[in-house]
Amino acid sequence: MKHLTEMVRRHKEGKTNGIYAVCSAHPLVLEAAIRYACANQTPLLIEATSNQVDQFGGYTGMTPADFRGFVCQLAESLNFPQDALILGGDHLGPNRWQNLPAAQAMANADDLIKSYVAAGFKKIHLDCSMSCQDDPVPLTDDIVAERAARLAKVAEETCREHFGEADLVYVIGTEVPVPGGAHETLSELAVTTPDAARATLEAHRHAFEKQGLSAIWPRIIALVVQPGVEFDHTNVIDYQPVKATALSQMVENYETLIFEAHSTDYQTPQSLRQLVIDHFAILKVGPALTFALREALFSLAAIEEELVPAKACSGLRQVLENVMLDRPEYWQSHYHGDGNARRLARGYSYSDRVRYYWPDSQIDDAFAHLVRNLADSPIPLPLISQYLPLQYVKVRSGELQPTPRELIINHIQDILAQYRTACEGQ
């Protein structure tokens, strides 16, 4: 995967560059990302998680082949070159099947890897850190590494079988806490120690050797670690470089390896840039992008209420609230407190559990209704200034068309711009 190996090579030469990974399956987020990469003539890394997309459909209802088809079709419609599009699989392993015995969970994980690789995903994050039903808690580094090596062997064989060569790149290791933001209120976070990072690497190197996979070690481009960044419902733990100095220096001893940082959402632009400088050069972003989508939609809904008679309004916010109350499975175990606290969290939490509800047909209908209502006549500039002030500046300068769709896309791209700036390097 030349874009990624080249990025790592340049970073190791001191260019302080990186790449961001868009972790979302929402069509508007993906359109915003593709159009932004197209305009800036940069490669684009889009990742699916094992929760979103698997051989059985995941929570999006898409298999890896479906997801690839969906993204590639969108890219083609936006004239984005296919060879600049990189697809990655995140947290691939027994994650979805922790309630099953390890043998069964790992058999499913084998099939998961096959389905991702056969579909053309080239960046594979092997994560076998989670305990299954009959496993000790926590797992030892050796068991985690043995399982990852088993999956790497499946990946290599599948890639050669389907594409005639093995050109995958791998990411190993995992962060704490769980993917997708912390469940509980945070105050401070433990940074991965250099010793723990070295132990993970050595366990994986040994396990890969046992599987006859020593030759692929240069294609293991990144180790997932915790540099001390996280968010919960209303707080962000900002990157503190001094706490990660030893970890940052440790990776300089490895010729072909950088770090991958998860949960970088909501970090300041300065923190994002410093993360890349400190070798956390793959920045994952997901909830912050759907959070920006939600912000734009709530703003447009407020504009709609000013312009359209109540009986003709989409009622998007109320429809969203009703659906979330009818189907609480995606937020109930995450949001705590009294009724008002949970109501606020459903709408505004940084963890953005609302992202799981956008595909719902009732919500999608309300969204379409909102866009129709606001597309009928130009949105008054003072209302754009009131509710989308960053976009207002661009509308006034002639950079941006004040249509509902363009306002949404541009608001999401404001977040992407922070990541691009952080990753540009010298």
From Swiss-Prot:
GO terms for cellular component: plasma membrane. Pathway: Carbohydrate metabolism; D-tagatose 6-phosphate degradation; D-glyceraldehyde 3-phosphate and glycerone phosphate from D-tagatose 6-phosphate: step 2/2. GO terms for biological process: carbohydrate metabolic process; D-tagatose 6-phosphate catabolic process; phosphoenolpyruvate-dependent sugar phosphotransferase system. InterPro entries: Aldolase_TIM (IPR013785), GatZ/KbaZ-like (IPR012062), GatZ_KbaZ_carbometab (IPR050303), TagBP_ald_KbaZ (IPR023435). Gene3D superfamilies: Aldolase class I, putative tagatose 6-phosphate kinase domain like. Pfam families: GatZ_KbaZ-like (PF08013). Belongs to the GatZ/KbaZ family. KbaZ subfamily. NCBIfam families: agaZ_gatZ, PRK15458.1. Component of the tagatose-1,6-bisphosphate aldolase KbaYZ that is required for full activity and stability of the Y subunit. Could have a chaperone-like function for the proper and stable folding of KbaY. When expressed alone, KbaZ does not show any aldolase activity. Forms a complex with KbaY. This is D-tagatose-1,6-bisphosphate aldolase subunit KbaZ. The lineage of its organism: Bacteria, Pseudomonadati, Pseudomonadota, Gammaproteobacteria, Enterobacterales.
